[in-house]
């Protein structure tokens, strides 16, 4: 059984027990979080697709920790113009473990 849900403008495909990185949610480690925006649930041959969300479906997860990703550096240089731009970005994330997929 797997589910597809939406969080922070992105879609994630998860199974029970999987560990994923979500956008930062400012929660304490070991706390529980409920993800309600479930787009689809697939259980063997049975597929349940929501319009836009599956009614009564939710995903229960546990927060493992919060952190920051590796730095991504973008560099632009315009030749012969002595013009350059360097920017760095680090993503803040919350690492969660999927405990249970509930479909009614």
From Swiss-Prot:
GO MF terms held by the record: rRNA binding; structural constituent of ribosome
UniProt GO cellular component terms: cytoplasm; ribonucleoprotein complex; ribosome
Keywords: Ribonucleoprotein, Ribosomal protein, RNA-binding, rRNA-binding
Biological processes per GO annotation: translation
PROSITE patterns (UniProt xref): RIBOSOMAL_L21
Family note: Belongs to the bacterial ribosomal protein bL21 family.
Subunit structure: Part of the 50S ribosomal subunit. Contacts protein L20.
Cited function: This protein binds to 23S rRNA in the presence of protein L20.
The protein's name: Large ribosomal subunit protein bL21
Gene: rplU
